[in-house]
């Protein structure tokens, strides 16, 4: 009888711990993850990918520039500081 009481207390404690842990992660008990902030699109991120800018690609690797940093503006790959893309190698084109 005494062990059942402790078992019930243990179950309640573990349940509370799980709820607190999920709230601390920002998940809560909601279908959408429970976070109070919605992810929003930022400029030049090519969709809702957590706010990270979309990077031009040479096949499966990130493209590099001779000057400046690579980015995708309006769906087209560009280099900052009037730079040019370094050669991808072969017939591979730079894509966004």
Curated annotation (Swiss-Prot):
Signal peptide extent: 1-26
Chief location of this protein within or outside the cell: secreted
Residue stretches of biased makeup (Low complexity): 41-51
Compositional bias per record (Basic residues), positions renumbered to this chain: 28-40
Cellular component aspect of the GO annotation: extracellular region; host cell nucleolus
Location of this chain's protein in the cell: Secreted; Host nucleus; Host nucleus, Host nucleolus
Keywords assigned: Host nucleus, Secreted, Signal, Virulence
Annotated region described as Nucleolar localization signal, given as residue ranges: 29-36
Keyword Lipid biosynthesis found: no
Chain positions covered by the region annotation Disordered: 27-51
Domain of life: Eukaryota
Induction: Expressed during host infection.
Function recorded in the entry: Rust effector delivered into infected tissues to modulate host functions and contribute to pathogen virulence. Binds the TGA1a-binding DNA sequence to repress the expression of genes involved in immune responses such as the defense-related transcription factors WRKY18, WRKY27, WRKY33, MYB51, the defense-related proteins NHL3, RPP8, YLS9, AZI1, CRK11 and the jasmonate pathway and regulation genes JAZ1, ASA1, ASB1.
Domain comment quoted from the record: The nucleolar localization signal (residues 29 to 38) is required for host nucleolar accumulation but not for the nuclear localization, nor for the augmented plant susceptibility to pathogens.
Name assigned to this protein: Candidate secreted effector protein MPL124478
């Amino acid at each position: 009888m005494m062990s059942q009481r402790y078992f019930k207390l243990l179950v309640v404690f573990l349940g509370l711990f799980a709820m607190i842990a999920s709230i601390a992660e920002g998940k809560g008990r909601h279908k959408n993850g429970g976070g109070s902030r919605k992810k929003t699109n930022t400029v030049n991120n090519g969709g809702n990918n957590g706010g990270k800018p979309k990077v031009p690609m040479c096949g499966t690797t990130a493209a590099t520039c001779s000057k400046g940093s690579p980015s995708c503006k309006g769906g087209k790959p560009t280099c900052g500081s009037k730079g040019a893309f370094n050669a991808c190698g072969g017939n591979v084109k730079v894509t966004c």
